[in-house]
């Protein structure tokens, strides 16, 4: 792998799967890694393994996300790379889904992504560099039965990534949305 031209990465929605694999690779490349999740206890093994720092965050709370970026900046340096990996699934038949559960799912998958991208942009634009990566799924391009809430959130996240890339790319910020299906 080519050398990564950044120093600090923040992964929001950290857990044992995709984000853990990414954290390991980034740490191996010499980046300082910040892991953010609702429950940091589940990150203790990954923190020990990679030397990453763990931060608690509710990705749907604007004040909490702003505080996360401030804390990471003060403790590790402003993140040059921000990866948004949080999502919430509410599987089931459309006619039977709890509307409030669907709303919460959308808040995590889409609104939380917006909050992360907004904070990253506020930090990166003045420097004229950085990378914002949003994890998607094939559900972001094709809905599946019994997964309406997940597809809605991933479609929205893809739209956010496309808009952010067009707005922030000319300012030196790389924005990408990539689909990863299956467990890691």
Label for each model-derived stretch:
Residues 7, 78-79, 93, 124-136, ...:
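Active-site loop of short-chain dehydrogenase/reductase
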Residues 117-118, 162:
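A short, exposed helix-loop element centered on a Lys and neighboring polar residues
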Residues 56-67, 99:
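The beta1-alpha1 cofactor-binding region of Rossmann-like NAD(H)/NADP(H)-dependent oxidoreductases
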Residues 15-16:
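Conserved glycine-rich cofactor-binding loop
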Residues 131-156, 162, 169:
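Catalytic loop of short-chain dehydrogenase/reductase
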Residues 31-44:
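Conserved glycine-rich Rossmann-like NAD(P)H-binding loop of the short-chain dehydrogenase/reductase
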Residues 93-94, 101-106:
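Substrate-binding pocket helix/loop in short-chain dehydrogenase/reductase
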